Amino acid sequence: MEVERSKKDDDLNNGSKSNEEEEISVERIFEESNEIPPPWQKQLTFRALIVSFILAILFTFVVMKLNLTTGIIPSLNISAGLLGFFFVKSWTKILNKAGFLKQPFTRQENTVIQTCVVASSGIAFSGGFGSYLFGMSDVVAKQSAEANTPLNIKNPHLGWMIGFLFVVSFLGLFSVVPLRKIMIVDFKLTYPSGTATAHLINSFHTPQGAKLAKKQVRALGKFFSFSFLWGFFQWFFATGDGCGFANFPTFGLKAYENKFYFDFSATYVGVGMICPYLINVSLLIGAILSWGVMWPLIGAQKGKWYAADLSSTSLHGLQGYRVFIAIAMILGDGLYNFIKVLGRTVFGLYKQFKNKDVLPINDHTSTAPVTISYDDKRRTELFLKDRIPSWFAVTGYVVLAIVSIITVPHIFHQLKWYHILIMYIIAPVLAFCNAYGCGLTDWSLASTYGKLAIFTIGAWAGASNGGVLAGLAACGVMMNIVSTASDLMQDFKTGYMTLASPRSMFLSQAIGTAMGCVISPCVFWLFYKAFPDFGQPGTAYPAPYALVYRNMSILGVEGFSALPKHCLMLCYIFFAAAVIVNGIRDALGPKWARFIPLPMAMAIPFYLGGYFTIDMCLGSLILFIWRKLNKPKADAYSSAVASGLICGEGIWTLPSSILALAGVKAPICMKFLSMASNNKVDAFLNPS
């Protein structure tokens, strides 16, 4: 998620073209087919909410699995829109044949479904189940020698997780509602992902688009079935740790020891097909640099740089270098992009207010005529028709803030009411900055704002007052506000271009958020209870960012004294390198920047290893060859095929979790041994 929330699919963005460039008016096409947008109450249909709920569960399992394995989560907007179209279209077709169809399926209803599903599954990310929230647990605390006292530990429980999410997840929705007209109509911000999703939904509801959508759904279904059955087949051979296809030493046992192998994950092959080539190559370069060069060299200093008798998971040993150097690169990349996007935001606002002709508050008219397309006129007219009153947004924010200020300190005693009050005072400004920056660059910095809260609130609370837990809880409060704010504005852009009412979009986002506040904790709880080694390094679900976030909080509270020898110097070097590499990328421009790796992507395998990068690079290779052989077909179907691969294996986690809870284990352990180890096993089993 750290990568994919920031770096969107290049193909998705390339499809985000402004309506001024369109030769044919989209809205005239729909008017010729006698489509009249229904009132906002009829856009929020019962069938739309039922389909949204089903898809929300599906996508939450997918996002949760990705969150707890590597933390890399691709955009699922296309999948949500496509499956929403398929389910409701099938529903209406059956009812129409039976003579019970009361309302046709519209693009506005399709937009409502997509918004609700993405809002719900988004809680699996912003809820921190793979980062700050699970980082509070004793499972993660035991992996660090510092701050693992009861004051800095809070184990997951369904009750407080659901309650916490309900009191912090809705404020972001109210914080930017009054600014929707300024952002969408006056500033005409692009919101590339929202625009691309709108183009997709509009295309579904044309005759040619409907035919293509059916073929895409068919392709998605085929690869969903393959991925699900492949996950089921693999389960039979993985009865214990180190068993199964996921531990196949593809490049030899030495490479396997250094985390270089193909683990036969259909999910990450699909993720690789969606992620841009540059991200996948950056991940591979990071894996080679760390596990191929750095860690073997630092490991050779065992007994000199760190004690030789430390366990492999001790942060005072080699694991400390892996975790803290990765943190340094993530912080360097995050700080650079925070300053860059903030600078663009301030400069963009300066230009907007300097050129007052674009603002409706100006009484003077421009001498130069401004050409407004028919589509823009029609969309603006309907977008401004169903207003959401500013008093409603302000009242909602204040009431929810008061409830949160009272409630959250009862959940986290270390986080005081005045900490939350200060965050809620500055949060609307940060939410606006994030929403505006996202509109310009498609770049959400929600996790960066969360890290700022970790350091500031954690240091303010202090080590003796549970500052580590306070920092992690503050991260959750801040992340949920700024993340939902930018998501809502993206959805407003989608609604603007599909003629969906802002009221139906707001309510859909709110309903989806409420669904996510229940579904995500329940799905996480299933993982947490089903797998005894959950959260441990080297297991099926290591939750890598949980340890990263906890150690960020420890650094903010206790400083650098706990780092192993020379680790701080290496952290400084890689922090600076991340800033410099980003600076070089921006200085060279897009033409050459595509050949320079992304520091954020390089940092992820520093801690995890290179096994998932092999899967993702294979996905890129498949897409590259497919495009060479048949580019139009690849562009039309690659997202559907990738989504099928991701969702199929993701959904297999539900039955596998239920089997684990029931105590049912796989019958076979398939392991790979060296010749020497195999001879020892044979001698033990067959003594002569």
Swiss-Prot record:
Domain of life: Eukaryota
Disulphide bond pairs: none
Record's subcellular location: Membrane
Keyword field contains Transport: yes
An example Gene Ontology CC term for this record: membrane
Stretches for region Disordered: 1-26
Bilayer topology: Multi-pass membrane protein
One Gene Ontology molecular-function label: oligopeptide transmembrane transporter activity
Transmembrane segments: 48-68, 71-91, 116-136, 158-178, 219-239, 278-298, 323-343, 392-412, 420-440, 452-472, 506-526, 560-580, 606-626, 644-664
Family, similarity comment: Belongs to the YSL (TC 2.A.67.2) family.
Role summary: May be involved in the transport of nicotianamine-chelated metals.
Name of the molecule in the record: Probable metal-nicotianamine transporter YSL7
Organism lineage: Eukaryota, Viridiplantae, Streptophyta, Embryophyta, Tracheophyta
